């Protein structure tokens, strides 16, 4: 069974919590544990915050797009911006790396995503934007997947 949702919103920090809760509510149909829901909310928060702060430099005119596809107990989550892009993806994925040290950002966003998800793919082009693909299987303990 396949189910999907798509969401677009202005790149405003106050929309991060809306995105987090919306995705968690959609994923709840898989009956994840409380810890698993917390993890998906954290991942959405990190990806959306990266888009707003780094992709759009806090320009509220930018648009963040989220797609979630659930198929056979697997969540496919995509977070996309059309911001400044990432010049060096490998460097950006290093723990503690940040382009905004003045904001006291921890530089752990991608590391957190990698720890909570089964797969994280980052595609980016300078001055065109960034897309983060995330995948998590909830099948192993779900009767829905049998």
From Swiss-Prot:
<dbReference type="InterPro" id="IPR050267">
    <property type="entry name" value="Anti-sigma-factor_SerPK"/>
</dbReference>
<dbReference type="Pfam" id="PF13581">
    <property type="entry name" value="HATPase_c_2"/>
</dbReference>
<comment type="function">
    <text>Binds to sigma F and blocks its ability to form an RNA polymerase holoenzyme (E-sigma F). Phosphorylates SpoIIAA on a serine residue. This phosphorylation may enable SpoIIAA to act as an anti-anti-sigma factor that counteracts SpoIIAB and thus releases sigma F from inhibition.</text>
</comment>
<dbReference type="InterPro" id="IPR036890">
    <property type="entry name" value="HATPase_C_sf"/>
</dbReference>
<keyword id="KW-0723">Serine/threonine-protein kinase</keyword>
<dbReference type="GO" id="GO:0004674">
    <property type="term" value="F:protein serine/threonine kinase activity"/>
</dbReference>
<keyword id="KW-0808">Transferase</keyword>
<dbReference type="GO" id="GO:0106310">
    <property type="term" value="F:protein serine kinase activity"/>
</dbReference>
<dbReference type="GO" id="GO:0030435">
    <property type="term" value="P:sporulation resulting in formation of a cellular spore"/>
</dbReference>
<keyword id="KW-0418">Kinase</keyword>
<keyword id="KW-0547">Nucleotide-binding</keyword>
<dbReference type="GO" id="GO:0016989">
    <property type="term" value="F:sigma factor antagonist activity"/>
</dbReference>
<dbReference type="GO" id="GO:0030436">
    <property type="term" value="P:asexual sporulation"/>
</dbReference>
<protein>
    <recommendedName>
        <fullName>Anti-sigma F factor</fullName>
        <ecNumber>2.7.11.1</ecNumber>
    </recommendedName>
</protein>
<dbReference type="InterPro" id="IPR010194">
    <property type="entry name" value="Anti-sigma_F"/>
</dbReference>
<keyword id="KW-0067">ATP-binding</keyword>
<comment type="similarity">
    <text>Belongs to the anti-sigma-factor family.</text>
</comment>
<keyword id="KW-0749">Sporulation</keyword>
<dbReference type="GO" id="GO:0005524">
    <property type="term" value="F:ATP binding"/>
</dbReference>
<dbReference type="GO" id="GO:0042174">
    <property type="term" value="P:negative regulation of sporulation resulting in formation of a cellular spore"/>
</dbReference>
